[in-house]
Amino acid sequence: MACVTTVGLGVIFFLFRVFSSGYTHMSICTPGFELEEFVFKVHRNHLHSGKRLGKVTFNNCDGRTRTLFQSIDKRFEINTDGTVTLKRQVTLHEGHKVFSVHAWDSSGMKHTASVRVERVPAQVESSSDVDLTKNKRVKRGWIIPPISVSENSKGPFPMRLVQIKSDYAIETRLAYKITGEGADLDPKGIFTIDRLSGWVSVTQLLDREKKASYKLRAHANGVDADVTEKPMDIIVTVTDQNDNKPVFTQNPFNGNVPEALEKGEVFMTVTATDADDKENTDNADISYVIISQDPPSPKPNMFAINPVSGGISVLEKGLDREQWFRYTLVITATDMNGEGLSTTGTAVITVTDSNDNAPLFEQSSYTASVPENQVGVEVAKLPVTDGDEPESTAWSTKYQIIAGDKGGFFNISTGPSRLEGIITTVKPLDYEKTKQYILSVIVVNDDKFVGPLPTSTATVTVNVKDVNEPPEFIPKEKFISRPENLPVGSNLIPFTAIDPDTEKKQNITYRIGNDPSDWLNITGSGQIQVKNALDRESSNVKDGKYKALILALDNDVESPATGTGTLVIELQDVNDNAPVINERTIKLCNRESAPVLLSITDKDLPPFAGPFKVEPQGDTSKNWSVFFNETGHFLNIKPQSQLEQGEYKVVLRVADREGESQENIIQASVCDCKGEAFQCTDKQVAGIPLFGVLGVLGGILLLLLLALLLLMFLRRKSNSKKEPLLPEDDVRDNIYYYDEEGGGEDDQDFDLSVLHRGLDNRPEVFRNDVAPTFMPAPQYRPRPANPEEIGTFIDDNLKAADNDPTAPPYDSLLVFDYEGGGSDAGSLSSLNTSSSGNDQDYDFLNEWGPRFKKLADMYGGGED
């Protein structure tokens, strides 16, 4: 009995230990999601904002019901109780959506689970719910679970994925097949289906980066019965695996950082990409880290990088371009938020200059001398130095005069080198007023200083040099008003100048510089007088004002100077001009003519001008009517009665308001016409009546008739003469002695009667060496009565003689170089060989006609 009791106690103790140990083991709790993947099913592809999808559960092991969740896809929001809702509208393009969810337990450890939102068909009535006793057709449907396959799966292949079925399979045997991309379309053969069971299998390894999903279509047909199921689309989703490293978009990255950039400011960004799924997984979530910095000065961690964005910023102060102008950073990009695959890149950072060095003048003081009265003169150049980067805005300089130039006489500008200030004068300096200027000049950069920097200052002492200045008229332009009828010699006004060189005690003399009308004179004391009569109506007077240039000259020995002043005389008008009619010639008809409008001008101004008065003078008042038009500014003139055609002088005396007048003569051409159609005929010529014209024409005709009768008489008388009218001393029959030196041509000894009669009226003139051509004899002009026409007369008769076939031999072409046989004249050498004149026989000269009678009488043995 004791033994049984002992055994019983041992069993009880053993059971207690077992249960106690089991209880202890069961009491250990591990925080985490209750599922690795939560699936939420929806019945449509378009999900609206605010829709509640489901709930994820997380065990904290501390009894808390609320947990901090974070969705990788920002379109989904997870409350602390695990409820998943949509923040904005989502469309399931592939029929599903997968994203990651993070949760943190009480110790701060992060946990991750997947959430899958997939579309499923609306719930259809299953075959178990159909009342077979009712004679009703039941709507059929497919049973297709979601299909997903992980990329890079190693099989074995073919690897079953899911089994699809149709409700017709309850009634009859079905044969299944699939079509679409990956089945019978490229890429072909990736997916297959068992014809009778409906198992869908994949035949090879898939790559999501090449194709993330495949769209198939399922078909079912009856084997034993004529049954065909409506085709159904199937989406096969390839889930991502982290099989791609991040890749930097460029390598290296280049950036610039100002040496005075504040801490935390981002100045450049590096980026990398990952081909893995970024929407549904964290396989493409990249984290950036700086691995090394070269040079590690002044501190090894001068820069920081944002792990998510890749933005690089300044972490520590101390960048100095003058010491370390470039840094090289080695950066890694790791996916899965820094826990996956990684790659390495480089960022090259160039430190750009900041204005941390103030420009400094090379000297603290300068001295310069400038002559007075000169503008634009360079006073001094102030060179500076700057330790910043050359040609940068932190290096180039600008200047300012801060003291010593209250009058604004100087300007300072940056020189071509951009490291010098150039002071110039912008106003003329006056030695007599200020002999010395002390200027304070500062220099700064175009860019602002970084931090508090001292400003360099220089002092410039400018000494003004005295030069001889021209006398100055005060005022430089003087206005006076005087009447234009001032008598010659009258004083107008004293116009004097002062010498600004008060220390020299110089004398000033005056001259007239420019006096266009020569009206003025100036005395040695500067008194301006009237030299010639003034005239306000002169062309040199503009707007009633006359300007003259006055000169003032000093007597400096080295460099005498001349000052100028302008005298403006406003001439007051007086009545010294009579009115004038502008139109001096008019034309009008003598019948029904409209009045001719005349305008009157007066050089004088009111009240010395209009209204005007007009008085016809002499016979004008008898033949012409003169009156003003309705405006009173224009004068109308017309004949009082019908006048004969001709030229008339119309004399009008025009007077102004004060009676200043003068006569105006208007030449009026009157034509025998009507109205305004002015057109003259030949009825009158130069004012001579018609009968006078006829008388003149008759006299001319009578004179022409008498001249014709006289000419006929002379021709008849000339035909009755037997002997030619050749004077004894005809120029062509004279013997000239050419051995007389100094003798001239008697070019005035010609017989006009020979030219007058013509050769055709002299029957004794003939040629026996030319056959007659029976051409009509030319007609020669008679001798003109007017001696001035002799030239024309000779030219015309010369042309007629050239064409006359009966012209004498001296008018024909002679060949003088032929002296052969048959020539009656023989050779000229015979004149020398003959012993006397009797050896020659000159009887043939008698045959040459009367033109050679004189020669025949001398040598032919005839009468003396």
UniProtKB/Swiss-Prot annotation:
Q: Which residues lie on this side of the membrane: Extracellular?
A: 23-692
Residues where Ca(2+) 3 binds: D274
Q: Which residues lie on this side of the membrane: Cytoplasmic?
A: 714-864
Q: What InterPro entries does UniProt report for this protein, alphabetically?
A: Cadherin (IPR039808), Cadherin-like_dom (IPR002126), Cadherin-like_sf (IPR015919), Cadherin_CS (IPR020894), Cadherin_pro_dom (IPR014868), Cadherin_Y-type_LIR (IPR000233), Catenin-bd_sf (IPR027397)
Membrane topology, as annotated: Single-pass type I membrane protein
Where is the protein found, in the record's own terms? Cell junction, Adherens junction; Cell membrane; Endosome; Golgi apparatus, trans-Golgi network
Q: Where is this site: Cleavage?
A: L714, R715, D733, N734
Q: Which PROSITE patterns match?
A: CADHERIN_1, CADHERIN_2
Cite the binding residues for Ca(2+) 1: D243
Q: Which UniProt keywords apply?
A: Calcium, Cell adhesion, Cell junction, Cell membrane, Cytoplasm, Endosome, Glycoprotein, Golgi apparatus, Membrane, Metal-binding, Phosphoprotein, Repeat, Signal, Transmembrane, Transmembrane helix
Kindly state the subunit structure of this protein.
Interacts with ctnna1 and jupa during early stages of oogenesis, interactions are no longer present when the oocyte develops into the unfertilized egg. Interacts with ctnnb1 during oogenesis and in the unfertilized egg.
- Description of its domains: Three calcium ions are usually bound at the interface of each cadherin domain and strengthen the connections, imparting a strong curvature to the full-length ectodomain.
Q: What is this protein called?
A: Cadherin-1
Recorded source organism is: Danio rerio
